[in-house]
Each structure stands twice: as structure tokens, then as C-alpha cells.
């Protein structure tokens, strides 16, 4: 038996706040074939219990740099040994978004930046990403770029890694 435990690099604990997002509603029904539990938000204790049951030592929670969820930030504040943050950045939002990234990382345990190209229908090779790439290098911050076919029924060509 191994004592190794996993790090889950993409955990969403506030799905209950996303019931209004059309592509997520369609993904719930068409892709995941899920019921109403799909849009369940978790408490800190529920999330830790689920992590322990699954053998997950640490979870990286996604938080938007513009209007970050206090709920998500509280997870990291309450249990910094179990939760870190991935700062969700919009490359189309310009320098103010990058300044928000710096501020968030200065105040909270941000371990990576994250972009989801289908949200903007821009491939990662688009010049609008370049300032983000530069900022991540300056901050010595890894960048997670979502690639492959998206689960939600949205355009996915921009996430084709080939």
C-alpha cells in the first residue's frame, strides 16, 4: 500500500453559483447526463471529506481574478495546507486583468494562472495571450491552458493542441 496522495489540479467548489450558465446547463444534461447534484456547491468540510475519501491531499481551486469568489478564497484561508488557487485569467481583458492577477497572487496562495480558450474562441497562439505569457514569466507562475475537446457544447477548435 502506498502512502502517496494525489493533487487534484482543477476543483470547482461553487458549482451552485453557475446554474444560470447556459453551456454548463447543456453540459450537465447532454454530456454528463447528471441530475441537479451537478450544480451543488460544497462546504469546506464536505470538500475535505470527499478529498480524503478519494486520496486527494491537496486541491487547486479555480478563482477568477475579476471579482474573485470569497467562498473560494475562504477555502484557501481556512486550510492552506489543503487548498491552493488557480487564477482564472481573461486574456482579452488587457492589462487591468494582469494587475488583478498580481494583486490576487500577492494576497492569496495562487500556484498557477489558468486560461480556458473556448471562453473567448481564441487559440493560445493569438497575440492577445502574449501579455499573460510575459506576466507569468515575470511572476514565475505556471500557466494552465485548457486544451482538447471541451465538455460543454461550445466551439472547441481554439483548444485543438495540434
Predicted regions and their residues:
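Active-site gating/metal-coordination segments in enzymes
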Residues: 57-58, 66-159
Amino acid at each position: 500500500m502506498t502512502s502517496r496522495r494525489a493533487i487534484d489540479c482543477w476543483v470547482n467548489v461553487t458549482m451552485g453559483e453557475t446554474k444560470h450558465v447556459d453551456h454548463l446547463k447543456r453540459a450537465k444534461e447532454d454530456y454528463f447526463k447528471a441530475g441537479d447534484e451537478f450544480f451543488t456547491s460544497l462546504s469546506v468540510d464536505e470538500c475535505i471529506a470527499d478529498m480524503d475519501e478519494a486520496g486527494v491531499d491537496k486541491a487547486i481551486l479555480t478563482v477568477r481574478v475579476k471579482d474573485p469568489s470569497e467562498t473560494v478564497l475562504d477555502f484557501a484561508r481556512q486550510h492552506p495546507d489543503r487548498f491552493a488557487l488557480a487564477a482564472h485569467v481573461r486574456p482579452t481583458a488587457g492589462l487591468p486583468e494582469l494587475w488583478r492577477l498580481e494583486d490576487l497572487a500577492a494576497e492569496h496562495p495562487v500556484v498557477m494562472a489558468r486560461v480556458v480558450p473556448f471562453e473567448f474562441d481564441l487559440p493560445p497562439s493569438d497575440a492577445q495571450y502574449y501579455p499573460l505569457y510575459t506576466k507569468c514569466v515575470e511572476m514565475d507562475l505556471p500557466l494552465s491552458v485548457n486544451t482538447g475537446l471541451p465538455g460543454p457544447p461550445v466551439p472547441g477548435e481554439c483548444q485543438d493542441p495540434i
